[in-house]
Swiss-Prot record:
GO MF term (any one): DNA-binding transcription factor activity, RNA polymerase II-specific
Encoding gene, per UniProt annotation: ZNF799
Pfam families: KRAB (PF01352), zf-C2H2 (PF00096), zf-C2H2_6 (PF13912)
UniProt subcellular location: Nucleus
Zn finger region (C2H2-type): 134-163, 169-191, 197-219, 225-247, 253-275, 281-303, 309-331, 337-359, 365-387, 393-415, 421-443, 449-470, 476-498, 504-526, 532-554, 560-582, 588-615, 621-643
Family: Belongs to the krueppel C2H2-type zinc-finger protein family.
UniProt keywords, alphabetically: DNA-binding, Metal-binding, Nucleus, Repeat, Transcription, Transcription regulation, Zinc, Zinc-finger
Organism: Homo sapiens (Human)
Primary location recorded for the protein, binned into one broad class: nucleus
Name of the molecule in the record: Zinc finger protein 799
Amino acid sequence: MASVALEDVAVNFTREEWALLGPCQKNLYKDVMQETIRNLDCVGMKWKDQNIEDQYRYPRKNLRCRMLERFVESKDGTQCGETSSQIQDSIVTKNTLPGVGPYESRMSGEVIMGHSSLNCYIRVGAGHKPYEYHECGEKPDTHKQRGKAFSYHNSLQTHERLHTGKKPYNCKECGKSFSSLGNLQRHMAVQRGDGPYKCKLCGKAFFWPSLLHMHERTHTGEKPYECKQCSKAFSFYSSYLRHERTHTGEKLYECKQCSKAFPDYSSCLRHERTHTGKKPYTCKQCGKAFSASTSLRRHETTHTDEKPYACQQCGKAFHHLGSFQRHMVMHTRDGPHKCKICGKGFDCPSSLKSHERTHTGEKLYECKQCGKALSHSSSFRRHMTMHTGDGPHKCKICGKAFVYPSVFQRHEKTHTAEKPYKCKQCGKAYRISSSLRRHETTHTGEKPYKCKCGKAFIDFYSFQNHKTTHAGEKPYECKECGKAFSCFQYLSQHRRTHTGEKPYECNTCKKAFSHFGNLKVHERIHSGEKPYECKECGKAFSWLTCFLRHERIHMREKPYECQQCGKAFTHSRFLQGHEKTHTGENPYECKECGKAFASLSSLHRHKKTHWKKTHTGENPYGCKECGKAFASLSSLHRHKKTH
C-alpha cells in the first residue's frame, strides 16, 4: 500500500561536500541516482523527473544522509513489508567511493555511510518507527494524531519541541531562535541572500519556491487561509491555527508565575519576560534592549533610511508592512467586500461587518459597570481596563497598568529623560517614534488626512476626532458636571480638572500639568522653541492650535458658527465660550473667592491675577526689556507692544 519514494533513499551532500567531489565522482553519483530511479520505476514507485545535479547543488538539509518520513502510493499496490524485504536482501558490502562507507544498496545504488546509517536505511524501507511521542496520544482532544511515531530519535526530539516550545538554535546576527538546525540554516541563508529563488520586489533570496511564494504574500496581501467561523483571512497557515484558538478558547501554555494561559508558546514566553524583565534582543547601534525580536527589527529601521514598503500611487514609503497596508486602505478602499451604504471596499467579510456598525450604530458590547456600549470587542476590552486597572503591564514608578506592552513602554518613557528618536533636520528628540513622525510633518507641511470640509490633518487619530464635530456625537459624559465629549481621551483629560490630578511634572521648574501635551508645550517656554511658522507673515508659534488660529486670520476662515445668533469663530473653544453667554452657565468656580467663570481658561487667568497677586504678590511674567513684572501672560504681551 505504501512504499519508498526517491527522496526516502537519496544521499544528500552539503554545498561544501559537493564542491569537493571531482568530475568522475560527480558522474558516478549521477549514474547511481539514475539507476536508483530506474529500479524504483521497475517496482512501480511514483517519482518526479528532476535535474539531479541542480537538486543536490542546493541541498534541502545539510545532513550527510537524510531519510524523509514521507511515503507515496505504489502503482501496483505493493505492500510496504514486501518492499522492505527486497531492500534488506539487496544490501551488499562494496567499497565504491573511497572513504565514504562500505555499504551500498544494489536495488537503489545508494551509498550508505556506515552501520548506523544502514540501520536507518532499513528502518525507512520497512516503515519501522521505534520512537513514539506519547504526549500526542495522551491528549486526544488537543492533537489529531495519537502517539505519533518517528524513524529517528532526532526527528522525535524536533517534534517534541512543538509541544515544549524549546528553540535551542539562535541566529548570531539577529538573535532569532529556532526549534531545529535546518530552520536556522534556512534563516541564515535568507540573511546572507543565498538561494536560487529571488523575490522580484525586495531581492530576498530563498532555497525553495514554496518559501518564496509564502514571502510574496507579504507584498501582494494574499490571504488564502480563511476562518470558517468569522471569515477572517490569513497569509500563513500558522497564523490561521493561532487564530482558531481564539474561538475554541484553547490555551496550552501557562505562565509559571501568574498562571495566565496563552494559545501559543511564543506569546507565553513574551509574557514571562514582563515578570523577569529579560530583554535578550539588543540593538547593535544604540544598545537598546528588547523583549521580542520583532520589536528589535522594528527599532532597527529607525536608525536606517530603509523603507522597503513603497506606495505606488503616492510614492510614500514605510518601514513596516502593517503601516503600509493601513496606508493603502486610505487610497483604494477597493476590497472585494463592498459596503452597500457608502461603497467602501474591504479585504474580508469581518472587516465589512465591523464597518457596517458605523452606519447602523449597532453596539454589541456593553460595559456592566458604567453602561457604555461599544461596537467592537477590542474597544470594549480597552474600555474595561479603565475600570479595573488590571492590565498585565504595570509601571513600577506610578503603578499604572496597561493592556499592551507597546503602550506600557511609551508610558515608561514619560518618567525618564530618554529621547531616542531624533529629527534629522533640526535635531529635536522625542520619546516615541510617532511623535517624531508628527514633528517631521511640520518641516514638510504634509497633511495626508483630508476631511470633506477641506480641513486636513497630520495624523489619522486627529482626523477621526475632527469627523465627530460634524456628526455632533458626544457619547462620553462627565458625571461631575455633565459636559459631553466626542472621545474618551478628552473625557479623561477633563476629569482631571475636577480631581486636580497633575501627573506630568516639568524637570526644569517642577511645575505640574494634568495633560502630557501641556507639559510638552510648557517646556518650549524654557527652550524658546517655536516650531510652527506662518508662511504668510513669518510669525512663529509654540502651539499648533495657536498657529492654526493665526492661519485663519489670513484666510478669514471662521468654521464654527453659533446656532443661536449666527456669530462665527475661528476656533471651537471660542464658540463654546460664546455659547455660555446665551445660557449664563459658569461651571468653573474659584475656590479662593467663589467667583465663577464660563471657561476654564478664564478661571486660570483669574487665579493668576487674583489669587497669586492678592495672596502672594507674585508676578511671574517679567519683561526682558525693562524688567517690569506682570501677573498674567496677556498683560505682559500688551505691555510689550509699548516697547
